[in-house]
Amino acid sequence: MKEMKPQYIYKATVTKVVDGDTVDLLVDCGFNIIRKERIRFYGVDAWETRGEEREDGLKAKKFVQDLLPIGAECIVRTGKERGKFGRYLGEIYIDGKSLNEMLLEEGHAEVYKK
């Protein structure tokens, strides 16, 4: 997975796990500024929750939900880059570990190639 740049690091709280590579977060930007953002996991492509990949996609989503239940706190590292649907791209950290990397290691996603 290639490195993101420039990088910004924020504390965030999970409000929804959309699928295996997208979450909705309340991002603490500092100075009492909280933003709702949909974050697409940078550099990974999880299986889709619809169509032929549905079963694997639901497993990927559950993997993320188990690690990031609603209300869980995490760290999001992001840049100015947005994905094709306008979502910020980010790397999510739980207890210092990259969720993006965990998805790849556990076989719930592949390296994003597009």
Task: Place the predicted regions along the sequence by residue.
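Small beta-barrel nucleic-acid-binding modules, primarily SNase/OB-fold domains
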Residues: 1-114
